[in-house]
Amino acid sequence: MTPLLSVHALHKRHGERLLFDIGRLDIAAGAAYVLTGANGSGKSTLLRMLGGLERSAACSVEFDGLHLPLYPYPRPLRHAIVYVHQHPIMFSTSVAHNIAYGLLARGGDRRLLRSLVDEAMDWAGVTHLRDNDPARLSGGEKQRVALARARVLQPRLLLLDEPTANLDGAAREQVIALIPTLIDQGASVIVACHDRDLINLPGVQRLKLRDGRLESR
Amino acid sequence: MGLLEATTGAFALLLRGDAALWHIVWVSVKTTLSGLILATPPAVVLGYLIAMHRFPGRRIAVWLAQAALSLPTVLIGLLLYLMLSRRGPLGDLGWLFSQPGIIAGQCLIGLPVLLAFTLAAVQALDPRYAETALAHGASRLRVMFSVLHEARYGVMAAVISGFGRVISEVGCALMVGGNIEGHTRTITTAIALETSKGDFAQGIALGIVLVTLALAMNGVLVLLQGDAHNPGARL
């Protein structure tokens, strides 16, 4: 099976310290992965590099049969891969406008925009927050809005950085419940996490960063 | 003339709508706003670019931007005078002792204030705003507009500080404008002139206008900041 994304010779240093050195990473289309590793092992950095938010040394990727550099981040990847922060930040507009942000930025069909946003809000269970000020949302609500904001773009690969970190109780369960539905919709998903309930999701492949190497289990 | 007498005379001048006085106010407001309108877009874009990008010499650029804040306006006036004088490189423009000359000076005086304050406002902003915009497929231009929108209160403070610095400066307007009555006389150059002539009433009247303008501009900022937590664009 041809992978959606193949990354070759991905490495990162913080000064003299080698954070990781990954010979090859293949991400299959429609597959889900959890990325684990100790704090400081480079999980977030790896996701940020794949999402084009972190500079990477000479490293090439194959995406949809195209050979591309990872830095400067190429446009085909920018439109196919969405990274979601551990603590998502909301623009100071309304919740609905936040969810529409990527659609507006990409200049999609404006007639479709409202129905896509409505559908994404319904999916994330945030319809009642539509016109609210995002600054007043709880951590769990922000995370669900961020997932809706990413999902509405129908990314080929979704990078979720510890989506349940600092959440507990119902907020955490609501976020966990959304992730399998993202996978079912055909997007490839990589979730960096420590959360046992996410690690044990059925059908999820496990990747672990240990001592600068990526282990596949 | 005592302070009380001068102040009473100042209010009388303001209330009876003294044409010469209000023309001076008009010249000041016109040249200040024109200078700011010209300075704001390049200063804000430059401030954003310096704040957001890492490049060789960035620290020198930040240092220069901040150091330019303390440039005496009279020095800017002197340099501009030399540029605009008949033998200067821009002498053919014929801007010396004219309102366009004052506007050029106001633009140069406002630019460092706008740049340094915008730089500080963007630098203080959470980097996740720009990252979120990028991660959701925004172009570099859209990222800039999104970041500046989030930093808008800082940018507005920059504009208001620029307004304050420009409208209250006297050195450059005096040197480049020449303080010509009915043409290039501004509030500050008029205050300097009238005070030297001993006509304190007009000086105080213009001072009251200057303070009122500064209060009004800052009042606008306070009102806008008070609205900061209301959600903006709706869908």
What are these regions (language model features)?
Chain A
Residues 168:
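ABC-family nucleotide-binding domains
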Residues 111-129:
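Conserved ABC ATPase "signature" region
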Residues 158-161:
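Catalytic Walker B motif of ABC-type/P-loop ATPase nucleotide-binding domains
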Residues 133-137, 141:
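Conserved ABC ATPase signature
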Residues 51:
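Helix-to-loop junction immediately C-terminal to a conserved catalytic motif
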Residues 88-97, 198:
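Conserved catalytic motifs of ABC-family nucleotide-binding domains
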Residues 59-69, 77:
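Conserved ABC transporter NBD signature motif
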